Structure formats: structure tokens, C-alpha cells
Amino acid sequence: VQSGTGEGTLAELSDGRVYYNSRCHMAVDGKRLISWSHDGGHRWVDWQACETLREVGEPFYFKYGTKPSYGCNAGLVRLPLETTNGKDVLLFSTPDNPGGTRICMTVWASFDGARTWPVKRLVYPGPSAYSSLAADTLGNIYLTYERGLSANIKCDIDHHKISLATFNLDWVLSGS
């Protein structure tokens, strides 16, 4: 795995490839790093910055000054093939805020092996951070995420509880 990445998420596609999407520590451009493996995770190729799924988080302050955003952990799941007519459908979750702070927990959908993420749906508009996704063979999707109390909180680490959102792919597809 490439240096400077961490808290990566993985999904195996139906053709055997493994997709890797990672938080990029100290990312200057605010982009997550992605890669694919064709051999079960032994070697990773096509390292690149993801243009759609961007990092969030305020600049990291330390005793010598300010560093770029430290990013945020995210969730990733491939939906069971029996719920998607045999097609790879990936879902990705993380806060989505162009302003940088950790708010607006959002789920994105990909239908082409994580090359593009054309659909996204807001789950929670307030403070939110780390998330995890799971799906069952009945079509239920489960999102756990850190959640704050107020969208007006300036401190992006004020996440008071873990929340569970349950939905299905149709709900995601009704997003933008």
C-alpha cells in the first residue's frame, strides 16, 4: 500500500479485482487515493487521486504551524450480487462538505467498478465523521456513523453518538 495512506476501505468486485479507497494523510489537494489489485491484494496498480470522493476535515494544527486537512475515515461496501441483478454496485460513505468541516454524511453509488460515482444521497446534514457500511441479501443497507448534535457546531470533533441508518438502493438512487 502506498505511503501516506491510512484507514483504507476495500471491496472485491465480481471479476476478482479488489478496489482500495484510502484517506490520504496531509492531502494538500483534498483528494482520497484509490487503487486496484488484480491478484487478491498482493500488488496495487493505477494509484490515483479520486476526483469525486474528496476528503473533509479542517487543517491539522500542531506546535509548528498548520498542516493540510488530515481527512476522514469512510465506509465502502459492494452490494450482494443477488440484490443487484448480478451487477457490481458499490456504495461509499463519508461527510461531503466543500467547506472542509465534517458535516453532511453522504452515501455515493458506483455502477462501473468504482470508476465513477454518479449518484449521491445526503443521510444527515449535521456534524458527522467516521462511518462504516454493510449490506444483506434482502436488500437492506446499514450505515453506522459518528453524529453530532447541531449543524452549527464549529468544532469538527464534536460527535456525541453513533447512529445507524437503514435504507435500500432505491432510496440512494432517489438522490442527485
Where are these regions (language model features)?
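Asp-box/BNR beta-propeller blade signature and adjacent active/binding-site loops
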Residues: 1-176
